[in-house]
From Swiss-Prot:
PANTHER family: TRANSMEMBRANE PROTEIN 254. The gene is TMEM254. It is found in: Membrane. This is Transmembrane protein 254. InterPro entries: TMEM254 (IPR028110). It is a multi-pass membrane protein.
Amino acid sequence: MGKARGDEAYFQRSSLFWVTIIILSFGYYTWVIFWPESIPYQSLGPLGPFTQYLLKHHHTLVHAWYWLAWMIHVGESLYAIVLCKSKGITNTWTQLLWFLQTFLFGLASLYYLIAFRPKHQKQT
């Protein structure tokens, strides 16, 4: 969290709020994709019947969107590496942290990297 050893190692954790929302959403979506028969649809309020409807009438689309979401996260992660290099974040471990965090949490992570403004070195 915050800065460590200057711009070359800048890293900021994503907001706990967004991390929680994304984990719960992707967790539920993964459950729907891989184990739909084990979901207690009646206990989920309006989300249960809606999920059943989507699986029954749009099964292929639900699966396609799931894999598309993961592919988008891969793309965002690769972009995070490019951004790290362009913003002077050269520490390999820090770049890996940005890659992993962006892969797991997408724009909730990438936002902090996009917003980061490195200090410019004075030319002498």
